[in-house]
């Protein structure tokens, strides 16, 4: 068996596993669309604008699919309900990026992917968690993931709340630029013209079907692997 074939088979099994993990997270969080896949698409668009290296973009897409594995592993009912969290619940929830990092390691994700999962709730002003990183201490990919995750969360419906319009979601992101989000990443997000179209990107697919496509013509696996 050739090295190339073994590598291709390994990649295929990895992407199937990662997509299944993403589907499990989406089901647990009860998003109307496959949320993690949509985050990956938005994050990749932003990363492309920053001329991020192909391998770094691949790691970012993988981390986007795995970012909330910690919430799934914790299995807390408060994650799925409307309303504010108690102080105890919020402290508990803030453990999920570290648990997600551990779950990503168990899934044999690369170390850079594990760290992006760990840092996807770090804030530009240093008030995020778990490590209170600030500004450029946070890797660019993690800053991109923070914005993409937030935008997708605002514009994806859940059983206890409707989705925001694109206009309202953008306004919410702008309001938090320089606080939660890197202003440079927000600027790129606002420059993207096809964010609404990416809703059609987030549709259920069979992870074993390498020919599966989405409405805008992207191939799910070519996006994941390139």
Question: Language-model features: where?
Answer:
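Histidine- and acidic-residue-rich, metal-dependent catalytic cores
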Residues: 2-226
């Amino acid at each position: 068996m050739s090295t190339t074939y073994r590598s291709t088979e390994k990649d295929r099994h990895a992407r199937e596993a990662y997509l299944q993990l993403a589907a499990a997270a989406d089901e647990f969080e009860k998003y109307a669309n496959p949320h993690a896949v949509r985050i990956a698409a938005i994050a990749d668009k932003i990363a492309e604008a920053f001329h991020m290296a192909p391998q770094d973009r691949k790691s970012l897409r993988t981390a986007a699919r795995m970012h909330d594995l910690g919430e799934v592993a914790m299995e807390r009912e408060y994650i799925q309900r409307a309303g504010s969290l108690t102080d105890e619940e919020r402290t508990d929830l803030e453990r999920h990026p570290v648990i997600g990092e551990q779950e990503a390691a168990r899934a044999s994700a690369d170390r850079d992917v594990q760290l992006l999962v760990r840092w996807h709730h770090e804030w530009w002003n240093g008030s995020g968690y778990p490590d209170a990183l600030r500004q450029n201490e946070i890797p660019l990919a993690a800053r991109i993931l923070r914005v993409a995750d937030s935008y997708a969360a605002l514009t994806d419906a859940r059983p206890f709340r409707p989705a925001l319009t694109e206009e309202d979601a953008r306004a919410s992101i702008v309001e938090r630029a320089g606080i939660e989000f890197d202003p440079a990443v927000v600027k790129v997000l606002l420059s993207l013209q096809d964010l609404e179209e990416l809703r059609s990107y987030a549709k259920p697919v069979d992870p074993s079907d390498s020919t599966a496509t989405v409405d805008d013509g992207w191939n799910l696996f070519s996006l994941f692997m390139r």
